[in-house]
Amino acid sequence: MQRLRARDLRAVDLYRTVKSNLDTKFSLPGMPPGREHRQVPPPWLQAMQKIPPSEILTRPIPIQHQKPNPKARKPKNIFRPQKIVYEEDELRKTFYRDHPWELARPRVILEIDGMDSHYCDWSQGLEQPSIPLSGESVVQRQLWLMHNEGMTKEKAYDLVRREFYALRQEEEVERRIAQEEARMVGAYFGKNRLQIGNELEDHEYERWKDWAATEMAKAEAERENAMPTFGGKAKDAEASIDDLMLEGSMDAILEEKKA
């Protein structure tokens, strides 16, 4: 029995192994000829025969998604599930690294029958029925060009990226025209994201200005409170020196008069 993390990892064929050993007959030294010895079945054999153990406690080797290293003499982590990597992962990572703001766009992930991807024909371009334009459209279109047109990853990405920019510009123009037409008939629109962001930035800047002014006032007050202390001592020292010089000059004048 092998124990790992306080779990019993019994072999799946434990019952079959013990059963086959019990069915084996053998003779012990000193036994009379024709007499065979049988093993005594363990007490748990009948219970395991009626209620076989589940296989959740076993450790089957997971499906290998990549070829093993032939140079590795001691394979490691053979029981650990391997990472599932798809071809689209690298394309998706590249696109969202170059266009991080696409992740901020709201998306509807609700599907009709779970087979929406089968209704798409990526040979016709990025615009597909009932599927809004998004980064996933770019990934699927690029993947189709790589598999069917024989393009490299960079060339397909550059071509699809230009198509994506053109469609985004069309959407922006349509949205702007619709907003202008609605305002002409009296519609009112609130602040957009850019205006809200500018106001938040201005508010934070004004708060920082107040804090900086307060800190400067505190520093100026501390400096003013410290200056009279040192200045007073200097003035007292200068006054004492002047008094001494004045007294010395008066004494000299009196001595001259006496002489």
UniProtKB/Swiss-Prot annotation:
Keyword Ribonucleoprotein in annotation: yes
Example of a GO cellular component annotation carried by this entry: mitochondrial small ribosomal subunit
Entry keywords, A to Z: Mitochondrion, Ribonucleoprotein, Ribosomal protein
Key word Ribosomal protein present: yes
GO molecular function annotations of the record: structural constituent of ribosome
Subcellular location, record wording: Mitochondrion
Entry's Gene Ontology BP terms: translation
A Pfam family assignment: MRP-S25
Annotated PANTHER family: 37S RIBOSOMAL PROTEIN S25, MITOCHONDRIAL, SMALL RIBOSOMAL SUBUNIT PROTEIN MS23
Family per similarity comment: Belongs to the mitochondrion-specific ribosomal protein mS23 family.
Subunit comment: Component of the mitochondrial small ribosomal subunit.
Designated name of the protein: Small ribosomal subunit protein mS23
Gene: RSM25
